[in-house]
């Protein structure tokens, strides 16, 4: 791959790297978004979000909202699997969205994109969705971070966006510097939903929490395997794990 562009947006410095078949957006030397002409999975956090969206009790949700679109990697995979689903996204960085239109074929995904602060948009929205994905991270000096407050009030605002039977997904970075937030959000999910599952890939440093009245088990993912034409994608799909989080013990 070779670097073809550098964009200094209001929120981050984005390097665009490209080869014949794929494109990467890199922020602080980490891959921030990825697109491939023939493949959809990476073994990283985007796979978790794609898989977790399919744990909706309907098995094929009719509408998905994503908070934090970036280059559209998750929507690239979801559109492949769900050609008729209504896809809506909110991202604060309009410049990276334009880069995605230019380099990652975002316009081909037939998704509605709002340029706004995601949590402010949530507070003002009256819409409801089968799946709500919270993937809001911003680039800090040395690492990514979550803006805003993650508390019961914030959880309640996200829950109001869920249609009956809907599920909420949250992408969490694991590891040093992120553990306290991970514990807090896990506890909020277990307090807020009757069913909570954790979705991971073995090579990734992230987990996706998935909460709702009903969240399907790992077996629900099997039906989607053959939708991937690449053997690499199928192998990565097979490695995704889904684990039930138990209810919190009373103090």
Regions found by a protein language model. Give the residues of each.
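SAM/dcSAM-binding transferase cores
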Residues: 1-18, 32-39, 43, 54-55, ...
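The AdoMet/dcAdoMet-binding core of the Class I SAM-like
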Residues: 6-7, 18, 40-167, 177-181, ...
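S-adenosyl-L-methionine
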Residues: 23-27
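Conserved S-adenosyl-L-methionine
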Residues: 193-204
């Amino acid at each position: 791959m070779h670097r073809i562009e550098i964009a200094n947006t209001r929120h981050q410095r984005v390097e665009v790297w490209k080869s014949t078949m794929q494109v990467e957006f890199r922020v602080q030397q980490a891959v921030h978004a990825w697109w491939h002409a023939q493949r959809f999975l990476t073994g990283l956090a985007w796979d978790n979000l794609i898989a977790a969206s399919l744990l909706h009790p309907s098995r094929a949700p009719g509408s998905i909202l994503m908070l934090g679109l970036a280059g559209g990697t998750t929507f690239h995979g979801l559109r492949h699997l769900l050609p008729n689903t209504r896809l809506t996204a909110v991202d604060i960085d309009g410049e990276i969205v334009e880069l995605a239109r230019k380099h990652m074929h975002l316009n081909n995904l037939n998704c509605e994109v709002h340029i706004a602060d995601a949590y402010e948009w949530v507070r003002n929205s009256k819409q409801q969705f089968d799946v709500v994905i919270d993937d809001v991270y911003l680039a800090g000096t040395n690492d990514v971070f979550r803006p805003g407050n993650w508390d019961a009030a914030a959880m309640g605002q996200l829950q109001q966006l869920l249609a009956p039977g809907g599920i909420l997904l949250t992408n969490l970075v694991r590891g040093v510097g992120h553990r306290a937030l991970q514990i807090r959000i896990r506890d909020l999910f277990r307090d807020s939903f009757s069913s909570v599952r954790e979705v991971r890939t073995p090579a990734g440093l992230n987990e996706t929490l998935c909460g709702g009245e009903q969240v399907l088990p790992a077996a629900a993912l099997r039906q989607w395997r053959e939708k991937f034409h690449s053997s690499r994608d199928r192998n990565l799909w097979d490695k995704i794990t889904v684990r039930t989080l138990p209810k919190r013990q009373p103090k």
